[in-house]
Amino acid sequence: MRDDETTVIGALVHRAVEGDAQATHDLLAHVHPLALRYCRSRLNRLPGDARHFVEDLAQEVCVAVLMALPRYKDTGRPFEAFVFAIAGHKVADLQRAAMRHPGSTAVPSDEMPERPDDSLGPEERALLSSDAAWAKKLLANLPENQRELLVLRVAVGLTAEETGQMLGMSPGAVRVAQHRALSRLRALAEQ
């Protein structure tokens, strides 16, 4: 996220909190891609078919942001941190549901597809799945704060400055923590 985008979002938030409908619409147009990227990066770690819920979950995040706007108070942190916190809670809710009731996140359908399935075949999925399982296992050995930092930096694509604002750290501390997390992952991978 660029500084000018953060400035635009900040101005939209101020107007949306005051009840400006167009600003609210424009704000949600900025929030949705952020929520989508965050949810996609977090749900890739889920077992089963929960990944099909990425778009729905991003919409839920947008609705939750919309509902929370009238009560939103600027605390000096970027509005994006507020969005990521809501998204984190929504992802955690879905993860808990998926773990409690395996298979409950499947998406059954009685309809025939309109076009052929161009997705990966069984062998390719197995290879990707084993790599994903291996990465998931490695990430599980990291503390939650290091996992979250890596998700924001690597999967969501935030800069060190933006990640620092989200997590309440300086950009230098983010870089050091990222280096330590990646070093730890490298050591775990070599075991």
Curated annotation (Swiss-Prot):
Description of what induces expression: Expression is enhanced during the late growth stage.
Chain ranges passing through the membrane: none
Coiled-coil ranges per UniProt: none
Region (Sigma-70 factor domain-4): 138-187
Region of interest (Disordered), ranges: 100-122
Gene3D superfamilies: 1.10.1740.10, Winged helix-like DNA-binding domain superfamily/Winged helix DNA-binding domain
One Pfam family recorded for the sequence: Sigma70_r4
Keywords: DNA-binding, Sigma factor, Transcription, Transcription regulation
Transcription regulation as UniProt keyword: yes
Gene inactivation effect: Deletion mutant shows a severe growth defect. Transcription of many genes, including hrdB (sigA), are down-regulated in the mutant strain.
Keyword Transcription regulation (UniProt): yes
Residues covered by region (Sigma-70 factor domain-2): 27-98
Biological process annotations from GO: DNA-templated transcription initiation
GO molecular-function term, one example from the UniProt record: sigma factor activity
Biased composition (Basic and acidic residues): 112-122
Location of the DNA-binding region in this protein: 160-179
Family under the similarity heading: Belongs to the sigma-70 factor family. ECF subfamily.
Role noted for this protein: Sigma factors are initiation factors that promote the attachment of RNA polymerase to specific initiation sites and are then released. Extracytoplasmic function (ECF) sigma factors are held in an inactive form by an anti-sigma factor until released. This alternative sigma factor governs the transcription of the principal sigma factor HrdB (SigA) throughout growth. Acts by binding to the promoter region.
Note on domains (UniProt): The sigma-70 factor domain-2 mediates sequence-specific interaction with the -10 element in promoter DNA, and plays an important role in melting the double-stranded DNA and the formation of the transcription bubble. The sigma-70 factor domain-2 mediates interaction with the RNA polymerase subunits RpoB and RpoC.
Protein name in UniProt: ECF RNA polymerase sigma factor ShbA
Annotated source species: Streptomyces griseus subsp. griseus (strain JCM 4626 / CBS 651.72 / NBRC 13350 / KCC S-0626 / ISP 5235)
Protein encoded by which gene: shbA
